[in-house]
Amino acid sequence: AQNLIVGADFATRFDNREYANNDFNESQTLFSARFTPRIGVEWMEKNRLIFGVDLLQNFGQHNGAREPFLSDVKPLIYYQFNSKNVQANAGIFDRKELLGDYSRAFFSDSTAFYHNRLSGFLGHYKSTERRNTYVEMAIDWEGMYSEESREMFRIISAGRYTLDKGFYFGYAFSMFHFAGKIGNENVTDNLLVNPYAGWEFNAYFDFDIKAGFLFAPQRGRSVDHNWKKPCGAQIDFVLTKWGVKLENNLYLGENLQPLRNIAVGEDIPITYGQDGLYAGEPFYATTEHI
């Protein structure tokens, strides 16, 4: 039997950023809305083929006489296999399909919202015996070799095992192949590994306390052929009640983005940071060890 699937997602984002004496980011307000209608077909209870459109409007964005109706319009189209324990996606699908707990050293909250589609493959296994216990891997093809775009792809993976009484441990991993484009043939390898452990418990509020290690080996082949190996530790504290969440992230360690302010080429006045090498929060480029 075949079933018709119809649905839609709606999300807004308001992010007011005010900084003083900050070298990493600019003060600004990000205010956007996204509407994503979907339609698809399901057969044999486990197979789905989904088509959708991602409609984004940045509030206050203007482009003169050529102003578009919307800030961005992009497709969603993917096949999904879904069973009791296993899910696999292939095509262009929403980032929300990921299960992994990825530190903002991997993806900033802005990256997660504005680069919300993955183009490639996702597979994960989720336990039905233990809560929040899973393993996943995904490949996101982010750029095609051309004059306008680098050839880029990212392999990500995450896993978590939840023990009794709320204790858990897990990992997150990313390998970003940041290759060249026509006129700028340099290649950069950028890896990030994050093993962690934590404890979830309730004491009137819901608490989640997690500590992890961040290791970021990377090599800019146009800069030199030496691997840079910065590392550090991160402690996350989350308090939740009545649908409201307070979160604090503390990073202690070395600059995880050492190529951020280095030019991508001798005759190219663009830094690796401006060119998109790092998807994580710029604050991880701290040189103050905190």
Language-model region placement:
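Exposed, low-structure sequence patches enriched in small/polar residues
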Residues: 11, 132-142, 148, 156-163, ...
